[in-house]
């Protein structure tokens, strides 16, 4: 198996099914965890020197921090309902507790924090929804924690790719600290597939091909993007979902398209305009 794939596993005692830490994968900024909790189960964690964004992938829960509490939050029972999720931002040096009111799947997105901002609820009404691309590179995007919203390091977004379409396309990268043209951001992809026995295809490659891997990605896999371009393809019959977590030295998303394929977006958008 590729070193860029972290597969999920059966829930352990605290419900964890996948965990990525900077130490475990050899980078500096992004951490990512997913917990599957049975109704009535409680997860309690300290954030320490990291900030967290808890994304309720499915189910309803009570979530509390040192100073705040939100009850019965959660709107969707499956990510493929395609409605924006409830999320909770938790600063560094805080504590969060998730009490499952139904069966719950919660993603914990992590990055270095300074405790600048207080804990807050991110309701579905505050999640920006956009349709990005056109034709067979069109996808639905939910901007959960974009750079326009306060956080110290984290950027969080979820994307739905229709069957037969490509996503994160044209291929782009953000691996150079070269602002204002490009930012350095590590990234994780947490993949879900509908139906669940299907697969996605993701390629991660650099200009010099020091990394060039094309991977078959299964339901629940995490793909690591330490650097390079990273397009995704959804085969016919299977729609894809992924939750992205990004973080780096500067909290801004400035990307650079692969010049060999940059023309594709302009061509697709022009074709879409002709159809109107």
From Swiss-Prot:
Q: Output one GO MF annotation.
A: 5-deoxy-D-glucuronate isomerase activity
Q: State which Enzyme Commission number(s) the record gives.
A: 5.3.1.30
Q: Which reaction does it catalyse?
A: 5-deoxy-D-glucuronate = 5-dehydro-2-deoxy-D-gluconate
Role noted for this protein? Involved in the isomerization of 5-deoxy-glucuronate (5DG) to 5-dehydro-2-deoxy-D-gluconate (DKG or 2-deoxy-5-keto-D-gluconate).
Top-down, what is the taxonomic lineage of the species of origin? Bacteria, Bacillati, Bacillota, Bacilli, Bacillales
Gene name, please?
A: iolB
Q: Please report which protein family the annotation says this sequence is part of.
A: Belongs to the isomerase IolB family.
Protein's name according to its UniProt entry: 5-deoxy-glucuronate isomerase
Q: What class of enzyme is it?
A: isomerase
